[in-house]
């Protein structure tokens, strides 16, 4: 046995081994610099002032949540105590349990645009109930001078219950996950499956946003490369009319998982290479084969299997006929695993594949230009300008309104702003079904935008 053959294989992130582990060449660095320059030119990065505003919003919400959690704890103590003296002694005997605000989505991944909203989940001990969250915490939010009653909309009956609010000029989606414990662990590891113990499905779904974000960052070889590539993928999807999870197209989580998958396959690649390989891989992807960045949880092997993850339904097309019907599975890494693109229909998938094919042509042009880069070339020279122009083509607006002859437009109206927000959200959630219903083979090829 040779020395090289006796070496243990290097561990890799993800389910499948890397395609290429080569380090970036000089022309890759030049193409990546041109990509970042183009993204900055398009305004996808937030300014320091914008970041300060966002931090202030989170600090304000954290202060309100801390006060609410402490007040709920005092009420719980009062309910258990027999009289006022007992209550005062109980309150003095221990410090109030803490709660935590955890950002997720684009803000946690640090790929948000200046106008992005903040996705955040409030994680609290068991004395903070969902009923109190929608009653007393919502009242506290409405009473805050920076928010006000008109800036808060509670959606209790949503698939994932949420409070939508506006703090100043910043929109926030606030979820709630009460854990089955008297005090939060210190530190709180949301990636530990044990945190799911005793939670109902609404709490699991609320917490999974934070779990997925943390796992995404832990499953990519280089988070900095991942962030640039993801910014590029999201901008491309927006420009081509593909960025809308509610329409059954690509949402933020979908894009993040796809970008992470490519990073795993090319662990040492530069951002420009990852973006190019993104189009190469997914233009030729054999759907409905799933995109996985972590091994899916195994189903219970027996009735005695008591692992936390096994007690919650995870995406599994072998066991679940509904999962088997999904057209383009992009599976979340955190247990219980879910198909983040469950709502993709035939017309949506056709639109995505069409734009992937066009994106592949554009990124191949970038690669050809970069291949002729010389080490002594100036980053402000003609070839660098050509690279930036090539990237701009990738982010050019869609020709959707010049390509088609017939369009369906849905107008939504209501008596007031609050009613319009609710009615518009309901109508939006049904539009993907309208697109699928309109799509008639041989007669109508519906194209959502």
Where do the protein language model's features map onto the residues?
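N-terminal regions immediately upstream of nucleotidyltransferase
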Residues: 1-115, 127-136, 143, 147, ...
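Pol beta-like nucleotidyltransferase catalytic core
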Residues: 9-36, 231, 241, 248-251, ...
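Acidic, Ser/Thr-rich intrinsically disordered and amphipathic helical segments
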Residues: 30-34, 52, 56, 60-63, ...
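Eukaryotic basic, amphipathic alpha-helical target segments in cytosolic regions
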Residues: 43-46, 62-76, 111, 126-128, ...
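Conserved aromatic-histidine-acidic binding/catalytic patches
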Residues: 49, 125, 221, 246-250
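Residues in well-ordered beta-strands of folded domains
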Residues: 102, 121, 164-166, 173-175, ...
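Acidic Asp/Glu-based divalent-cation binding sites
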Residues: 115-121
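Conserved NTP/Mg2+-binding pocket subregion across the NTase superfamily
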Residues: 144, 150-152, 157-244, 321, ...
């Amino acid at each position: 046995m040779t020395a090289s053959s006796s070496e243990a294989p290097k561990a890799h992130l993800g389910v499948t081994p890397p395609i290429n582990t080569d380090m970036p060449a000089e022309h890759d660095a030049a193409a990546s610099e041109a990509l970042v320059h183009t993204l900055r030119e398009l305004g996808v990065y937030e300014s320091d002032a914008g970041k300060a505003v966002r931090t202030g919003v989170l600090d304000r919400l954290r202060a309100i949540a801390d006060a609410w959690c402490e007040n709920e704890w005092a009420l719980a103590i009062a309910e258990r105590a027999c009289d006022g003296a007992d209550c005062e002694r109980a309150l003095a005997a221990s410090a109030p349990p803490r709660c935590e605000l955890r950002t997720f989505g684009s803000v946690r991944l640090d790929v948000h645009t200046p106008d992005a909203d903040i996705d955040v989940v409030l994680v609290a001990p068991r004395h903070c109930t969902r009923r109190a969250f929608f009653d007393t915490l919502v009242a506290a939010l409405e009473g805050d001078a920076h928010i006000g009653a008109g800036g808060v909309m509670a959606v209790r009956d949503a698939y994932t219950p949420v409070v939508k609010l506006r703090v100043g000029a910043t929109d926030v989606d606030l979820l709630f996950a009460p854990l089955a414990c008297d005090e939060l662990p210190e530190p709180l590891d949301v990636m530990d499956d044990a945190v799911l113990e005793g939670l109902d499905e609404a709490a699991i779904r609320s917490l999974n946003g934070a779990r997925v974000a943390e796992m995404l960052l832990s499953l990519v070889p280089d988070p900095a490369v991942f962030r640039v590539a993801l910014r590029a993928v999201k901008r491309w999807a927006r420009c081509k009319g593909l960025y809308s999870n509610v329409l059954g197209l690509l949402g933020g989580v979908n894009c993040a998982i796809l970008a992470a998958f490519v990073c795993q396959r090319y662990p040492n690649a530069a951002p420009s290479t990852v973006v190019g390989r993104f189009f190469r891989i997914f233009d030729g992807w054999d759907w409905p084969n799933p995109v996985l960045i972590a091994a899916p949880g195994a189903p219970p092997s027996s009735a005695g299997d008591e692992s936390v993850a096994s007690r919650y339904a995870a995406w599994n097309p072998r066991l679940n006929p509904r999962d088997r019907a999904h057209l383009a599975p992009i599976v979340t890494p955190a247990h219980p695993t879910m198909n983040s693109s469950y709502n993709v229909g035939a017309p949506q998938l056709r639109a995505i594949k069409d734009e992937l094919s066009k994106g592949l042509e554009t990124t191949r042009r970038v690669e050809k230009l970069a291949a002729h880069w010389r080490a002594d070339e100036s980053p402000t020279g003609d070839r660098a300008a050509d690279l930036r122009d090539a990237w701009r083509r990738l982010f050019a607006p869609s020709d959707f309104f010049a390509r088609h002859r017939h369009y369906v437009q849905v107008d939504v109206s209501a008596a007031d702003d609050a009613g319009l927000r609710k009615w518009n959200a309901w109508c939006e959630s049904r539009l993907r079904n309208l697109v699928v219903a309109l799509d008639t083979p041989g007669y109508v090829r519906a194209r959502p935008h």
